[in-house]
């Protein structure tokens, strides 16, 4: 069941074309189905009993990056990812989500990441900040993590990294919406980070987004604050603790 607030956004978006030029998926495929308007129209039809939520519709809801380009450009404040994410919850609950998606969900539930592999550990002690590496950087672009830690060391920042870093919930939340399983992941992650007593520097902006926007809503706010790695390094540059090469 899609909540009334999400349906309200869908009903408004189904009349509007103003963000169709911003969707990267629609640009790539050329399909009207990939515009936020079309997805809003589909859910409106389901709500009015004019269409059933079937596998084809579920697949359409997964043809979205949840990048928020549409939301950021909306002059009236509507949020297509809100109803698209809830449509994904409906797809999973109704057992019409694509098999490939269900496999990724299984991977996240067993390993904490969509790749289905053991996450490398970057564990180290530190006293100034705790760096949250995240799943993508740890597994797919480890050089990003290594370079960030090297920069912090050069700036004299004592950075702690958890030996067993919990999943933030962002991957599962993107795949199946903000369900109870996602909130439980968030609670575990927030509790673990809060136990360090240190401010959190987050390497992946997607992890930072869920930590700053959803964790407080779910009652598991990170007490010492969250900063993205880019913002933290920018501050170090401003404070002359790092110098950019010409």
Locate predicted features.
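Short boundary motifs at domain starts and secondary-structure transition points
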Residues: 119-126, 238-246
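Iron-sulfur-cluster electron-transfer modules
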Residues: 10, 40-219
């Amino acid at each position: 069941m899609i909540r009334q607030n999400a349906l309200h956004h869908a009903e408004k978006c189904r009349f509007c074309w103003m963000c169709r030029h911003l969707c990267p998926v629609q640009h790539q495929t050329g399909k009207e189905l990939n515009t936020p308007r079309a997805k809003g129209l589909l859910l409106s039809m389901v709500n009015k009993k004019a269409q059933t939520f079937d596998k084809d519709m579920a697949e359409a809801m997964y043809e979205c990056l949840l990048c928020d380009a549409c939301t950021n450009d909306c002059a009236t404040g509507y949020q297509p990812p809100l109803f698209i994410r809830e449509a994904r919850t409906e797809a999973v609950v109704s057992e019409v989500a694509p098999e490939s998606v269900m496999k990724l969900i299984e991977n996240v539930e067993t390993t904490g990441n969509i790749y289905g592999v053991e996450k490398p550990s970057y564990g180290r002690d530190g006293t100034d900040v705790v760096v949250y590496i995240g799943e993508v950087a740890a597994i797919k672009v480890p050089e990003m993590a290594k370079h960030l830690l090297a920069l912090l060391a050069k700036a004299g920042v004592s950075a702690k990294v958890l030996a067993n870093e919990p999943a933030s919930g962002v991957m599962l939340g993107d795949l199946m919406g903000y369900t109870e399983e996602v909130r439980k992941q968030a609670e575990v992650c927030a509790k673990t980070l809060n136990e360090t007593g240190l401010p959190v520097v987050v390497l992946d902006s997607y992890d930072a987004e869920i930590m700053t926007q959803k964790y407080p809503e779910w009652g598991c706010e990170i007490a010492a604050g969250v900063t993205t790695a880019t913002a933290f390094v920018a501050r170090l540059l401003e404070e002359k603790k790092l110098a950019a090469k010409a």
